[in-house]
Regions:
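Exported/periplasmic ABC-transporter solute-binding proteins
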Residues: 21-50, 54-61, 65-71, 78-81, ...
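N-terminal hydrophobic alpha-helix used for membrane targeting or insertion
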Residues: 6-7, 63
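Positively charged n-region of N-terminal signal peptides that target proteins for export
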Residues: 1-4
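Bacterial N-terminal signal peptides
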Residues: 7-16
Length: 247
């Protein structure tokens, strides 16, 4: 009988612990360009708090569509300010905040292209047959790259060479695997360990990317989400963001 009672107590304790742990989580929708720093940030946050962080990485436009269709995210970290603001105006999110500022660069794994001077000369180089640009309709970094191309009157002349992956992380992977010769990508990708396998060129004409986030109204564990949002602006996280070229 004593063993049976102890068993029941252990079972109840396990059930209580499991229930508590299940509620201590943050479900984040994160723009693909921020994937590398976010993984480090989440790992550090989890090590300091009894909260698990689950992330989905995709283009900002794709994630916005999921949120509007009822996806159970707690927080949205976009690659622009417009989408979080739109969600807030629709009553789906709290007031937006800025969590990072990023830049577009041109990246290549091809050593011969690394010797060329300037991104404009690289994309016009005879050996460049395919150029990865994240879909401008759903990826803010792709839209910014198009601004730079248009300013240099290169968009129309290079149109046949463009390949449009859905998000900026995929665009980088295309060039990394040499499925394309070059890629317009986030500086964070160029500064990653994989990015060091090639070289990158500054694209000064591309507007800076101001990245906004928001806490969604359907967030379940609001206390955990609040902790995470505060953590995003901590000196430790700022150091991680700076390492990947964000301000």
């Amino acid at each position: 009988m004593k063993r049976y009672i102890l068993f029941l107590l252990a079972l109840l304790l396990f059930a209580f612990s499991s229930t508590a742990a299940a509620g201590e989580s943050v479900n984040a929708a994160v723009a693909a360009n921020f994937m590398q720093p976010f993984k480090e940030i989440a790992k550090s946050f989890e090590s300091q708090n009894s909260v698990s962080v689950v992330a989905t990485f995709a283009s900002s436009g794709h994630l916005t569509g999921q949120i509007m269709n009822g996806a159970p995210y707690d927080i949205f970290l976009s690659a622009d300010e417009e989408r979080p603001a739109a969600l807030s105006q629709k009553g789906l999110a709290e007031k937006p905040f800025v969590y990072a500022r990023g830049r577009v660069v041109l990246w290549t794994a091809k050593k011969e292209l690394c010797r060329v001077s300037g991104w404009q000369e690289v994309v016009k180089h005879p050996s460049v047959k395919k150029i990865a640009v994240a879909s401008p309709k759903v990826a803010p970094y792709g839209a910014a790259a198009m601004v730079a191309l248009e300013q240099n009157r290169l968009r129309d002349t290079l149109q046949q060479k463009f390949v449009y992956p859905e998000n900026i992380a995929q665009a980088f992977q295309y060039a990394l695997t040499e499925s394309t010769d070059v890629s317009f990508c986030a500086l964070s990708s160029a500064l990653s360990e994989q990015g060091k396998k090639g070289c990158y060129f500054e694209v000064g004409e591309a507007p800076p990317i101001v990245q906004g986030g928001c806490v969604l109204m359907r967030a379940k564990d609001r206390e955990a989400v609040k902790k995470f949002v505060n953590f995003l602006n901590s000196p430790e996280v700022n150091s991680i963001k700076n390492k990947y070229g964000y301000k």
